[in-house]
Amino acid sequence: MAPEQWEATSQVSLTFEDVAVLFTRDEWKKLVPSQRSLYREVMLENYSNLASLGFPFTKPKVISLLQQGEDPWKVEEEGPGGFSLGLKCSQRTTKSTQTQDSSFRELIMRKSKRKEPWNMKSENLSIHEGKLEEKWDVNASTIERSYKSNELSPKSHREKRSSECEKQISYLSNPLGITPDKRYKCSMCEKTFINTSSLRKHEKNHSGEKLFKCKECSKAFSQSSALIQHQITHTGEKPYVCKECGKAFTLSTSLYKHLRTHTVEKSYRCKECGKSFGRRSGLFIHQKVHAGENPYKYNPGRKASTSLSGCQRIHSRKKTYLCNECGNTFKSSSSLRYHQRIHTGEKPFKCSECGRAFSQSASLIQHERIHTGEKPYRCSECGKGFTSISRLNRHRIIHTGEKFYNCNECGKALSSHSTLIIHERIHTGEKPCKCKVCGKAFRQSSALIQHQRMHTGERPYKCNECGKTFRCNSSLSNHQRTHTGEKPYRCQECGMSFGQSSALIQHRRIHTGEKPFKCNTCGKTFRQSSSRIAHQRIHTGEKPYECNTCGKLFNHRSSLTNHYKIHVDEDP
């Protein structure tokens, strides 16, 4: 199109006033900061779109103000309506109708909630430049003819101009006529998105691209928002605080779930026994008790049956991947695959230092820190470092003293629900973690893992000072205190300090007189379990300690040590 033709058509087709949205002073005051920000975004974007099409107009003053981050009006420049755009108007009178303001308010409220754009970005317009010019030729000539036929009747023109300009604005917003709901489709899984940025973020899930790396632990993420959320684990920051009880959380979603404990009644009721729950997930888990096992089986990777009733259908939308072995459900197929390794025993992630294998890459990364000595999670109170966020969270309880979960049997307060479950097994006698080699059972999986190292001979924890190795991290920590001389456990009664917490517990029994270990044969009690075991050999006649020189047997190690002195004295 020739420049003179562009100039002619632009005078009668579309000016910046046509796409500008006006607010009065009172209306502007009612907008919250996020809505004002969205207003700036839309105005600048509309101006950019018009400028990219070559419209011959000078930059309006409102655009200059918005680009500088200022409000779109100055007090001294206010017009009678309380708002001045600072525009150079054309022949026609630009009016801010109540309908237009109301429409924008609806749009701005809707976008602030849904986080969706109104129109296509300027770069998308340039992609379809050829089609844009073709469409513009048609619309420009149509509007020009309309203008000539009505140029003697300004009122008639203004009425028709409104509908024609709306068409042009609609075209600028969506040059290809694509529906605004879902425009962009992923070529890998055919999932659709409303904008290109969402599509690009989604495509990183397929490509595995992770551009955002944590400087503390080197963990990489595909999105910057995920990195920001992860970095809170290092700083220990908990910006979301419950106003009811003061408990703090790292995520807003965690705070939202917690608030339900204060505000939401137990509205999810089991039809079988009448028990109520505060969350649907609690009811869903409880219903498995009645069902015995989940009857809706499926092939791995396929979604579970949706032919469920009542609240189960709600959960099938949230957790749709079902494990055939135990009936647990998961939100994604990848979570199901990770879980199934528990049943199959598959451990594809192997440590290059000690050869230990893991079912998940995150477990391997955490394990490797044992060898490197890296402790990226640091306590903000005392500066102590930890290899995992879970260990840091457990440590923080020392400073805060928070204990929210009480045992119904003994009243003991515990800091987490998982700790409470393990503690309750003391009362029930349940030991679900069983060693496949010797059959010995344990209350928790960590105790089983440590026990299994007795069979494998694995000692992954090494002292950097003397090179001595240990089966568990706590043994290494206790040993390292022999080098440093550190004794952090102090008795409040007498002031005596100890290098191990177990030594302090045993020492306290001297002050309290407590002897919890009782011999079943004679009823004698002892402060230590080892003392009871040694005592019971009197009844059984067991003598496990043998002298290598003369073969004599003893029931105590100390007796064997004293016996060795006889042979030492006999040597010339």
Curated annotation (Swiss-Prot):
Annotated Pfam families: KRAB (PF01352), zf-C2H2 (PF00096)
GO molecular function, one term: DNA binding
Sequence ranges assigned to domain KRAB in this UniProt record: 14-85
SUPFAM superfamilies cross-referenced by the UniProt entry: beta-beta-alpha zinc fingers, KRAB domain (Kruppel-associated box)
One GO-annotated biological process of the protein: regulation of DNA-templated transcription
Keyword Protein biosynthesis found: no
Subcellular location, principal: nucleus
Tissue specificity annotation: Highly expressed in eye and kidney. Detected at high levels in adult brain and kidney, and at lower levels in adult liver, lung, skeletal muscle, heart, salivary gland, testis and tongue. Detected in embryonic brain, heart, lung,kidney and gut.
Keyword Transferase: no
Recorded coiled-coil stretches: none
ZnF C2H2-type span: 184-206, 212-234, 240-262, 268-290, 321-343, 349-371, 377-399, 405-427, 431-455, 461-483, 489-511, 517-539, 545-567
Subcellular location: Nucleus
GO cellular component, one term: nucleus
Cross-link (Glycyl lysine isopeptide (Lys-Gly) (interchain with G-Cter in SUMO2)): K121, K155, K238
Keywords: Activator, Developmental protein, DNA-binding, Isopeptide bond, Metal-binding, Nucleus, Repeat, Transcription, Transcription regulation, Ubl conjugation, Zinc, Zinc-finger
Record function comment: It may play a role in renal development and may also be involved in the repair of the kidney after ischemia-reperfusion or folic acid administration.
Family classification: Belongs to the krueppel C2H2-type zinc-finger protein family.
Protein name: Zinc finger protein 354A
Originating gene: Znf354a
